[in-house]
């Protein structure tokens, strides 16, 4: 992999990981459309750690407060808002982790085709539009009860299907259970910390077992570019979300899905 390819693929990962348009779909599609060889497991690990570093850095104050309050609540059994949000993130992660272990091979074998990606891109794009139009949008992320967290957690499982978008489906579910746009996005990004962390650790395990040669320049480029682009993406997405809504992302998904159908049918 040359540096130009590393920069492009890292930008794709960084710019799509937190937008509701599916990073996995774009990373699958770019090599198909460009004719590039698969970027390899080591590069996948690099860009996952890059985006993980971005979200942890951006939400470092919130994550630190949540961790302290959660640990304190274990002793006092009197959780405050930050501790309850930490419990919500933990609960919201369990179904994804279990499903990832159970269905990983099935998904890798049968659900990574361009036509599957085209279908999920369109279907879940329309669902995002519906949720944005009809959701009550009256709650913040600190007012999530167990039932609403479970709905978002189960929705996140669908993100295992390429083209769905983890951020897209969790924001959609958040809007459907009454979160406002910013709260739905923030909770989605908090959920991404364990989600991306689990993916990075799983890929790291596979990388160590495979003992493949590593292009350290491409790896360093992937971490840096994906991390910086992801951080900027989070910042500007949250800044502009209430103003622009979800419609631009819905339109993008519909256009992308149609283009994929035309190309691969």
Language-model-detected regions and their locations in the chain:
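Multi-pass membrane proteins that catalyze or facilitate reactions on polyprenyl-/lipid-phosphate substrates
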Residues: 1-265
